[in-house]
Amino acid sequence: MAKQIKKIAVLTSGGDAPGMNAAIRGVVRAALNEGLEVYGVQDGYYGLYTDRVIPLDRRSVSETINRGGTFLGSARFPQFKDPDVRKKSVETLKKYDIDALVVIGGDGSYMGAKLITEEFGYPCIGIPGTIDNDIVGTDYTIGYQTALETAVEAIDRLRDTSTSHQRISIVEIMGRHCGDLTISAALASGCEYIIVPEKGLDKESLMRNIEDGFNKGKRHAIIAITELMTDVQALAKEIEDRFGHETRATVLGHIQRGGAPCPFDRILASRMGVYAVDLLLQGHGGRCIGIKNENLVHHDIIDAINNMRRPFKEELFEAARKLF
């Protein structure tokens, strides 16, 4: 029989994403309405290790649903891989008699929750919060749609100036090893070429595509590429040297993580926050939440990390490619 849950904690970990505050709010208010006590862990797993734990009430999350970032703070804490660090972190939970933990973040955050679940049998629920949309078991992650809107707006602005100056523009978009954000942003803004990790960078194919565009009468081009694939400044120079056409690279960078979350992310985050509390009250632990075909689902967090594979958006990529 599962232990009765009386106190829970929530933390945000890894890179911030618009909608994290809405998810925290969802967890806190749903838990309070069920008669639970709620604590917030500041600065992610680092705060768990250093005992940065604060009580949360309804006022703590008032006026946060529309705010970007995470008011609890976040941090990357690779030291959490050390078993002694994890042991001390769990002692912090025990100090406050916390019965369960909700973790909002990406795959690194899930790994921390997985280890706490495996090693200490602690009920953890993972909520996917990352603009990269690279978490398995869910169609969308919290923050992705807002980041997409930000990227599209930036590309639209770049197209204005690229058109005016007959310039080739390379736009580097976040996503790490997942091309979802790049593909969707490129499709929505009519980019002439897309380069994503799942397909790799074929420079000769890129050059042929640019040349074909010029032969068809195009006077400018926008190339969307996922971060970490190549030095975009060097690529811009290669293209300019090849065609004698002014080429500039723009790295959108961390601006994609900021700003107020869009309505989709606010709704998704709120639903997932409520669902996390429901799962804990039902006796679930070691689960991660997702959304599939508009329905909330949950998976074993260990299985999600070890065995599940995120499908590549081939249809979207091909649709965008046919519109070059």
Swiss-Prot record:
Q: Which domain of life is it from?
A: Bacteria
Q: Which GO terms describe its biological process?
A: canonical glycolysis; fructose 1,6-bisphosphate metabolic process; fructose 6-phosphate metabolic process
The signal peptide, as residue positions, is none
Q: Which residues participate in ADP binding?
A: 25-29, 159, 190-192, 216, 218-220
Q: Give, as in the UniProt entry, the pathway in which the protein acts.
A: Carbohydrate degradation; glycolysis; D-glyceraldehyde 3-phosphate and glycerone phosphate from D-glucose: step 3/4
Keyword rRNA-binding recorded: no
The record's CDD domains line, in alphabetical order, gives:
Bacterial_PFK
Similarity comment:
Belongs to the phosphofructokinase type A (PFKA) family. ATP-dependent PFK group I subfamily. Prokaryotic clade 'B1' sub-subfamily.
| Protein name per UniProt | ATP-dependent 6-phosphofructokinase
